[in-house]
C-alpha cells in the first residue's frame, strides 16, 4: 500500500511551486511545467522521494534513533507540534535558537532551568517567600522558555535526523545539522537548494495543507519505526529466554553421567562374577 496517494498530494496542493521569477535553478529537475507564472512540481517524483524518506525515517527510529521536527513558519507550526506530539518526538515550532544543535550542552542547561521553573510552578508552595514581582519575573521566564524550548524539553541528546518544513527559513538549523553530519529530511519548494538536503521531498512548503500532509507522512514513518523497534526487542527477548531454557551440558553433569556409567559397569561385572561362581559350584556338585 502506498504511503500517500497522488490524489492526496493534488488535493493538498503539493504540486504548486513558487512564481517563475522566484526559483532556484537547481530545482529544475523536479519541475514538470509552468502554469500562469507558477512552476508545477512533478508529483510522480515526489511520490518516489516520499517513499525513500519514509523508509529512512522508519529505519532510523527502528534502530533507536529520534527525529527532530522543525517548522517555525505560521503555516507549519500547528502541524509540526501536533504530529511530533502524536509520535512522541521533539519539535521546534516557534523560534530556532542558534546553537540548538551545535551548542546542545548549553541548551540542555536551559532545559534544566525550564524543568526547575515548571516544578516550582506545579508545587503547592513553590513561590512561598517570594514577592509578587519575583513571582511575575519567574512566570515570564518560564513562559518564554516553554515557548522556545517546550517542544524539546525531553530531548537529552542531539537528534539522529531532522525533519524541516522550508529549508530557506530554517537555514540555521540546516547549517547546524550539516556541521554535525545529521541527515536532513525536508520539503523542497522550487526556491530551495536541494544540495543541503539528504532526503528531499519536492513539494509546496507554503500551503498549510501541504505542510500538514507531508509532516503527517514523516510522523507515520516514525510510528512504523517504533513498532518495528518494539517487535525487534520482543523477538530478541524471546530468543534470549529460549537460550536460557535450553539444556546446558556442564562439567558437573558430565562427571555425574560418567560416574553413573561406571557404577552400571561395576554392577554388570559383579553380576557376571556371581553367575560364573554359581555355575562353577553347580558343576562341582555334579
Swiss-Prot record:
Residues 255-280 have a biased composition (Low complexity). PANTHER family: 30S RIBOSOMAL PROTEIN S2 PROKARYOTIC AND ORGANELLAR (PTHR12534), SMALL RIBOSOMAL SUBUNIT PROTEIN US2M (PTHR12534:SF0). GO terms for molecular function: structural constituent of ribosome. Pfam families: Ribosomal_S2 (PF00318). Belongs to the universal ribosomal protein uS2 family. One of its GO terms (biological process) is translation. Keywords: Ribonucleoprotein, Ribosomal protein. The keyword Transferase does not apply. Residues 231-286 are annotated as: Disordered. CDD domains: RPS2. The keyword Transit peptide does not apply. GO terms for cellular component: cytosolic small ribosomal subunit. This is Small ribosomal subunit protein uS2. NCBIfam families: rpsB_bact.
Amino acid at each position: 500500500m502506498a504511503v500517500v496517494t497522488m490524489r492526496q498530494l493534488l488535493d493538498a496542493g503539493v504540486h504548486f511551486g513558487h512564481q517563475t521569477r522566484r526559483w532556484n535553478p537547481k530545482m529544475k529537475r523536479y519541475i514538470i511545467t509552468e502554469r500562469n507564472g507558477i512552476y508545477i512540481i512533478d508529483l510522480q517524483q515526489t511520490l518516489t522521494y516520499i517513499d525513500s524518506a519514509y523508509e529512512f525515517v522508519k529505519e532510523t527510529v527502528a534502530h533507536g534513533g529520534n527525529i527532530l521536527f522543525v517548522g517555525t513558519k505560521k503555516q507549519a507550526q500547528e502541524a509540526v507540534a501536533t504530529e511530533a506530539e502524536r509520535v512522541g518526538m521533539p519539535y521546534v515550532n516557534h523560534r530556532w535558537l542558534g546553537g540548538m544543535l551545535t551548542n546542545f550542552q548549553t541548551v540542555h542547561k536551559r532545559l534544566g532551568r525550564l524543568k526547575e521553573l515548571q516544578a516550582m510552578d506545579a508545587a503547592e508552595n513553590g513561590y512561598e517567600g517570594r514577592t509578587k514581582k519575583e513571582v511575575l519575573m519567574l512566570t515570564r521566564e518560564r513562559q518564554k522558555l516553554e515557548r522556545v524550548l517546550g517542544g524539546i524539553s525531553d530531548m537529552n541528546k542531539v537528534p539522529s535526523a531532522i525533519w524541516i518544513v522550508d529549508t530557506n527559513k530554517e537555514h540555521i538549523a540546516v547549517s547546524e545539522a550539516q556541521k554535525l553530519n545529521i541527515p536532513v529530511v525536508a520539503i523542497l519548494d522550487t526556491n530551495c537548494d536541494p544540495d543541503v538536503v539528504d532526503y528531499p521531498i519536492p513539494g509546496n512548503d507554503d500551503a498549510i495543507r501541504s505542510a500538514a500532509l507531508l509532516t503527517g507522512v514523516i510522523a507515520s514513518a516514525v510510528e512504523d519505526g517504533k513498532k518495528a523497534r518494539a517487535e525487534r526487542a520482543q523477538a530478541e527477548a524471546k530468543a534470549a529466554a529460549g537460550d536460557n531454557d535450553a539444556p546446558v551440558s556442564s562439567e558437573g553433569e558430565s562427571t555425574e553421567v560418567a560416574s553413573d556409567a561406571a557404577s552400571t559397569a561395576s554392577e554388570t561385572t559383579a553380576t557376571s562374577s556371581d553367575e560364573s561362581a554359581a555355575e562353577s559350584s553347580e558343576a562341582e556338585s555334579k
